[in-house]
Swiss-Prot record:
Keywords: 4Fe-4S, Iron, Iron-sulfur, Isoprene biosynthesis, Metal-binding, Oxidoreductase. Its cofactor is [4Fe-4S] cluster. Its EC number is 1.17.7.4. The keyword Glycosyltransferase does not apply. CDD domains: lytB_ispH (cd13944). Belongs to the IspH family. It comes from Nitratidesulfovibrio vulgaris (strain ATCC 29579 / DSM 644 / CCUG 34227 / NCIMB 8303 / VKM B-1760 / Hildenborough) (Desulfovibrio vulgaris). PANTHER family: 4-HYDROXY-3-METHYLBUT-2-ENYL DIPHOSPHATE REDUCTASE (PTHR30426:SF0). Coiled coil: none annotated. This is 4-hydroxy-3-methylbut-2-enyl diphosphate reductase. The gene is ispH. Binds 1 [4Fe-4S] cluster per subunit.
Amino acid sequence: MNVIRARTAGFCMGVSLALRKLDREVDRAEEKAAQGSPRCRIATFGPIIHNPQVLEAYAGMGVRCLRQVDEVEAGDHVVIRAHGVPQQQEKALRSRDAVVVDATCPKVKKAQLGIEEQCRAGRTLLLFGEAEHPEVRGLLSYAGEGALVFGSVDELEGLPLQPETEYFLAAQTTQDRVAFEVARAWLHERLGHEVPVLETICDATRLRQQEAIDIARKVDAMVVVGGFDSGNTRRLADVAAAQGVFTVHVENESQLPVEQLRGCGIIGLTAGASTPKSIIDATQRFLESL
């Protein structure tokens, strides 16, 4: 089986940075314990990234995943997830007697602050994203009153837009660039003027999606590897499938539909921004063995 593997597959800068920060806290805790000091409790606030294998590995190291601020105990070292958290939660975390390490992706943090600046200038946010995604909940916390979220152009068309309101447009950092531009054009037509835009979709997302499209146009089937909870991985699968090629999204090689793939001559392989290289490698080896 011939496999074309995306060069952009695997950890992005934001994920790598978040994991390095968490690893540093784990290492420091182990060093203190080795010196005879009590081992401090390490936790993340929400899943550090959306990958089940990575989360399982950290759980095996004793890292807890907290969901509520009141779960934080005195002396805890708490690492904020790569997706960021609502600013009210961050303030509450920092009010606890704990060490708080912010592992929010720098691209997400930039989006948060950009949204806050626009809203302070009197504009109202139109956010292209998944309403229930943790990054989106965090972004909205910087937007104040009146912010509107839409997950598609169809949803945008159904929003109660007011002609007298000064809007600005932003997106979840891992959103589909093409769909974002369609939304931008629709707003221009609907409101009769260009809406100010925050360019919040990160370059890594754009490059991954474009490479997935390019590969999908050359192959008989496309395999996308990554957590089912990972929004950026789901969108890679979406943009690949939109090219008309059979596309499957799996979390590891054991989930591959072997019989459907066996007859393919060339298979494309890409992976989400939170997928470890070891899982991508294992998937590639399995595909090449078919």
